[in-house]
C-alpha cells in the first residue's frame, strides 16, 4: 500500500509540472472488518478485551473529517467491538481504556447502555481504567463498569450537564443587522440566538438540563452503590477531581496503572496467564504495548481544483463545514477546561 501511495503521489507531481491534466487520487479508505490483535502475550485460552473509549464522545453516522478521513462515531465503534466480543467464548473480561472529556448526552447514554447490555447478556465482568481524563460523560460511561480505576495523574469528575447558546441580538444592533424570524410559536426559536432569551425560556431549558443532570446522578448511584445520594449531590457540582480525591469521594475504586489493572483483572477471573487483545481495522500498524491505539485513522483525500491557468493540485483541502457534524447535540456531558 505504501509503494502504491508513493507511486500515486509521484504521478500527481508529474501531472502538476506538465500543467495539462487533472488528477484525483482518493486516499480515504472505508473501514474494514475488525481484526484481533494481541497486545500482551499469554496462554492460548482466556482473553481480556482492551476496549478504547477516547476523544469526544459521539453518536450517529460515520463522518469524514479533514486530515483523518472516515471515522465512525464512538457509539458505533464500541458497539461493533462489543458485538464481536460476544461471539468469542474465550473472552473472560473487558477493560474499558477511557481517555475522554465526555461528549454529547445521548452518546454518553448510549455507550453506558451498550456496556450494561453486554454485561447482562454475557455475564462477563467489565472494568474501567481512566488515563489522562475520564470526565463528565466519560465518567458516566465508566459507571457501567463493575470497578473503576484511575491512573495517578487522571482528572475525573465534572459530573453535570452544560449547554451554550450564543446570543447575537445585541451584536446585530451594533452592526446594523437584523434577522426576521417567522415562527408558529413564541418558543420555536428559543435557541436560535437572533433574539435574547426571556426568563421563561431560560426556565424551559434549565428544566431540561436539570432532568438530564438527575439522569446522570441516577447512573452514578446505580454504578456506585456505596455512595449516598446526599453525598453525591455535594460532590457532583461540576468540579473535577484528582485521582486520589476521586477515590476518597467514592467515585473510583483505586489508583492503578493500566498494566496493574490488567494484572488485577487476571487475578479476579482466575486467569493468571490470560492474554490481552484489542480489535483494530487495518494491518498496517504493529501492536507491542497495552498503551497502543486500537485504531488507525485513514488519511484525507487529495482532491483536484481547476484554475484559469491550467491545473492546480490541492494536497490539503480543508472543508471547514466538515469540522462540525451535521447534527450537533444541544446538551453535553462534557468537561470544558
Residue ranges and their predicted role:
Residues 2-9, 13-134, 145-151, 162-337:
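N-terminal organellar transit peptides
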Residues 135-136, 155-159:
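Short gly/pro/ser/thr-enriched loop/turn and capping motifs at secondary-structure boundaries
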Amino acid at each position: 500500500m505504501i509503494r502504491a501511495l508513493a507511486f500515486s503521489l509521484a504521478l500527481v507531481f508529474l501531472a502538476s509540472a506538465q500543467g495539462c491534466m487533472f488528477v484525483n487520487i482518493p486516499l480515504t479508505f472505508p473501514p474494514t472488518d475488525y481484526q484481533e490483535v494481541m497486545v500482551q502475550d499469554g496462554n492460548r485460552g482466556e482473553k481480556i478485551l482492551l476496549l478504547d473509549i477516547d476523544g469526544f464522545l459521539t453518536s450517529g453516522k460515520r463522518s469524514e473529517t479533514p486530515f483523518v478521513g472516515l471515522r465512525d462515531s464512538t457509539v458505533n465503534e464500541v458497539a461493533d467491538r462489543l458485538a464481536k466480543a460476544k461471539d468469542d467464548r474465550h473472552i473472560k473480561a473487558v477493560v474499558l481504556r477511557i481517555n475522554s472529556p465526555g461528549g454529547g448526552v445521548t452518546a454518553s447514554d448510549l455507550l453506558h447502555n451498550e456496556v450494561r447490555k453486554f454485561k447482562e447478556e454475557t455475564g462477563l465482568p467489565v472494568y474501567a481504567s481512566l488515563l489522562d481524563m475520564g470526565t463528565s460523560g466519560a465518567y458516566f460511561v465508566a459507571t457501567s463498569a463493575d470497578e473503576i480505576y484511575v491512573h495517578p495523574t487522571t482528572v475525573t469528575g465534572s459530573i453535570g450537564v452544560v449547554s451554550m447558546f450564543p446570543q447575537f441580538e445585541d451584536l446585530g444592533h451594533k452592526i446594523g443587522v437584523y434577522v426576521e424570524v417567522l415562527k408558529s410559536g413564541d418558543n420555536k426559536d428559543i435557541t436560535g440566538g437572533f433574539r435574547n432569551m426571556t426568563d421563561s425560556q431560560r426556565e424551559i431549558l434549565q428544566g431540561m438540563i436539570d432532568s438530564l443532570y438527575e439522569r446522570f446522578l441516577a447512573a452514578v448511584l446505580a454504578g456506585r452503590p456505596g455512595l449516598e445520594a446526599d453525598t453525591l449531590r455535594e460532590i457532583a457540582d461540576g468540579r473535577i477531581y484528582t485521582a486520589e480525591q476521586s477515590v476518597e469521594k467514592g467515585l473510583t475504586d483505586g489508583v492503578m496503572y493500566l498494566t496493574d489493572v490488567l494484572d488485577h483483572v487476571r487475578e479476579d477471573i482466575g486467569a493468571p496467564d490470560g492474554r490481552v487483545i484489542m480489535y483494530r481495522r487495518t494491518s498496517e500498524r504493529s501492536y507491542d504495548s497495552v498503551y497502543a491505539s486500537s485504531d488507525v485513522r485513514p488519511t484525507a483525500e487529495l482532491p483536484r481544483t481547476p484554475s484559469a491557468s491550467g491545473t492546480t493540485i490541492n494536497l490539503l483541502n480543508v472543508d471547514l463545514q466538515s469540522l462540525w457534524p451535521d447534527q450537533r447535540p444541544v446538551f453535553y456531558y462534557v468537561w470544558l477546561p
